[in-house]
Amino acid sequence: VTMRRAALSAIRGREISLVFQSPGATLNPVRKIGSQFVETICYHTNLTRREAREKAAAILQKLNMRETERVLDGYAFELSGGMKQRVSIAMALALEPKLLLADEPTSALDATVQKAVVEELLALHREMGTAIVIVTHNMMLSAYMADRIAVMYAGEIVEIGAKAEVMDAPQHPYTQALIASIPRLDEEKELKGIDGRRIDLAVLPPGCIFANRCDRAVAICSMRAPRLQAVGADHHVACHLCGKEDVRDVRQ
């Protein structure tokens, strides 16, 4: 990125916002929530502090938070994990960004709060038109929220496409293994794990990054890295064996 710091600061928060995995690390523990909220809004707008606080309260109410004044006058350590996450999301959406990056937004929450946060994100996406990019290890969350899914392994995209294509007809061995490892209440099958160990990211292999854990790997997999290739109108996979008749689906 060659953009100057001042230009980047104008974009961050205003055009692009980020929700961190740990809401506790996002909020300053020695400053009141309202002070942090107002500072964020005033930095990017011409609103007065009073107007900024009113806007903060309105956003918190939209996220179904009660006693907004008490929340704004309180500190982060006085809030539950779910409330802190909602405050973080509210701060990220305060300026109605065009893009919201959410890093594991539900991983630190219990199931009930997870569902509430997910529904709030989807509702805000519909109402505000904000594009949302979610980073998660939860394939079911991706299946529920996403329009398109990109599966990454060791920092590289190994499969990307429309949700229905990736979830219903996965082509990469890693994607298939991930889906096979999802517990299902309607099936009495033994859970499948992924054999082997992760590669050292400091010493990447010359071939496929998943070859040492893939039960379908052949010689070329260890010698040459595969490139993303189209297997559908909106479906790309990085696998040398993709499309070969002898390739079996590990979910079976």
Each language-model region and where it sits:
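ABC ATPase NBD coupling module
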Residues: 1-17, 35, 43, 165-170, ...
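ABC-type ATPase nucleotide-binding domains, specifically the catalytic core motifs of the NBD
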Residues: 2-8, 35-51, 61-66, 78, ...
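Conserved ABC ATPase "signature" region
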Residues: 51-70, 122, 179
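Short catalytic/signature loops enriched in Gly
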Residues: 69-72, 160-252
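Conserved ABC ATPase signature
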Residues: 75-79, 83
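A short, proline-enriched helix->beta-strand linker immediately N-terminal to the Walker B motif
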Residues: 94-98
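P-loop NTP-binding/switch modules centered on Walker-like glycine-rich loops
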Residues: 101, 105, 109-189
